[in-house]
Design a protein with these regions (language model features):
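Anion-binding and metal-coordination hotspots
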Residues: 1-263
Length: 263
């Protein structure tokens, strides 16, 4: 991991991050990047280092407008894909970025488009003097574009990109489920030590969660296990009897509860 100050833009940290990874003896061959990292300089850097990547194209880019102007018949059966319970349309286009052949995946989410259109029309009708180009915004509603250095089967495009989101959700557990709020620290060693503890805690949390799902959530399991008590003596700890629910949870977690623990 790498700790970066919040006032440093994402687009400027990629080069140093790759350099640090290389100095650790790790060969980076894949990258999943949010739109904040997109720039011609970063794309060129990834290509020079032969790193395959997938990134979201910012809507402010000219390339975004060019591609959305060419979507044509995207809302047809042949471009339909399922991602979980979401039905979407995904269309592949071959493009050139930094003189390199790449693949653009234009994704249209019908539900998001309907929501965006409703909000835009509501605002336009309530504020007729509003200067925003409503027609253009409606045209872009529900659309986003992913750029990849390698060709990806349409059914695998969103799972590949949303791996990043899954990682972000994992760190969300550190703030919500685990109450691992950042400490007030004043040195890089302290924040790196804190992040190491977060990684260790999250690793344990995820391992336990995987064993419990889909029958039980971690929140429900931890609430149930609060009822587990123990008596503490001078030289030993004796856990009290488990109820049926606690036994089931420990069985799923493959954890054996000892009859006695030394102090």
């Amino acid at each position: 991991f790498r700790a970066v100050s919040g006032d440093i833009p994402d687009v400027s940290v990629l080069g140093n991050t790759l350099d640090e990874i290389a100095r650790l003896g790790i060969e980076a061959d894949q990258a999943i990047l949010d739109a904040g990292f997109y720039s011609e300089k970063n794309i060129k850097l990834l290509c020079e280092r032969n790193i395959n990547f997938i990134t979201r194209l910012p809507k402010s880019r000219t390339l975004f407008k060019t591609l959305t102007d060419q979507i044509g018949d995207i809302e047809t059966r042949k471009y339909a894909c399922m991602y979980g319970e979401r039905a979407l349309f995904i269309k592949e286009e071959t493009i050139s970025v930094c003189d390199t052949l790449m693949y653009a995946y234009i994704v249209l989410d019908p539900d998001k488009k309907a929501k965006d259109t409703r909000l835009l029309l509501k605002e336009a009708l309530e504020k007729p003097d509003h200067d925003a180009d409503v027609d253009l915004q409606i045209k872009k509603g529900g659309l986003f574009i992913l750029i990849s250095k390698t060709q990806i089967p349409l059914q695998e495009v969103l799972p590949a990109y949303y791996t990043r989101q899954n990682i972000e959700q994992v760190f969300g557990f550190a703030k919500s489920n685990n109450n691992l709020l950042p400490l007030r620290v004043h040195s890089r060693d302290a924040i790196n030590g804190y992040l190491l503890l977060v990684f260790m805690t999250l690793s344990l949390f995820i391992m336990l969660r995987q064993k419990l799902q889909p029958k039980l959530t971690m929140d429900a399991a931890l609430i149930s296990l609060r009822n587990l008590k123990a008596k503490i003596y001078d030289k030993e700890i004796i856990p009290q009897e488990l109820n049926k629910k606690s036994k089931t949870i420990f069985d799923q977690l493959e954890i054996m509860v000892p009859k006695m623990l030394g102090v």
